[in-house]
């Protein structure tokens, strides 16, 4: 998988470590992801990924910013009209420019895969397959990796731990550049 995306409503709390060791418990994990929803892999073209990124802003003034895995970087401009906010030249996947004609493997939760929060572009994904539960992926990620770091910054994400959660969705499925 090249990219994982999570809707902000899928993260219900910060995943803050209990102490300096970085330990977290199941209750905290459950607070972060109470739904226990399925994870879906799919194939999207680069053009479809750009379309999904643009769907973060609506003509009615609402927005729902996606939480991407660390493999995706892009800039957007709120001063641009809806449908033209993503700076397409800035979009990088694994540090390389996104190729609109190329196919990419993407993982999202089942809510997004079914056009949740108005992200209709995910319904166009090809080769969709359900492969596990989001909470279990987070537990596997936390069990296999280093302790949860304390947040250092916040930006587009609800918290820096939202990025950890998006990466956890794709644990074992992200390809290397």
Where do the model's predicted regions map?
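Catalytic centers of hydrolytic enzymes
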Residues: 1-177
């Amino acid at each position: 998988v090249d990219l994982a995306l999570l809707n902000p409503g899928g993260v219900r709390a910060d995943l803050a470590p209990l102490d300096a060791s970085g330990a977290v418990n199941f209750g905290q994990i459950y607070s972060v992801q109470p739904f226990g929803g399925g994870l879906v892999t799919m194939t999207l073209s680069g053009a479809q990924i750009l379309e999904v990124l643009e769907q973060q802003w609506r003509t009615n003034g609402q927005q729902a910013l996606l939480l991407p895995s660390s493999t995706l970087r892009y800039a957007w401009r709120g001063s641009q009209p809806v449908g033209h906010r993503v700076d397409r030249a800035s979009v990088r996947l694994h540090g390389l420019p996104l190729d609109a004609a190329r196919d990419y493997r993407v993982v999202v939760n089942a809510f997004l895969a079914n056009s949740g929060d108005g992200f209709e572009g995910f319904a166009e994904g090809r080769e969709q397959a359900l492969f596990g539960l989001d909470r279990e992926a987070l537990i596997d990620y936390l069990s296999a990796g280093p302790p949860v770091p304390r947040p250092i910054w916040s930006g587009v994400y609800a918290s820096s731990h939202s990025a950890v959660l998006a990466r956890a969705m794709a644990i074992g499925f992200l390809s290397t550049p």
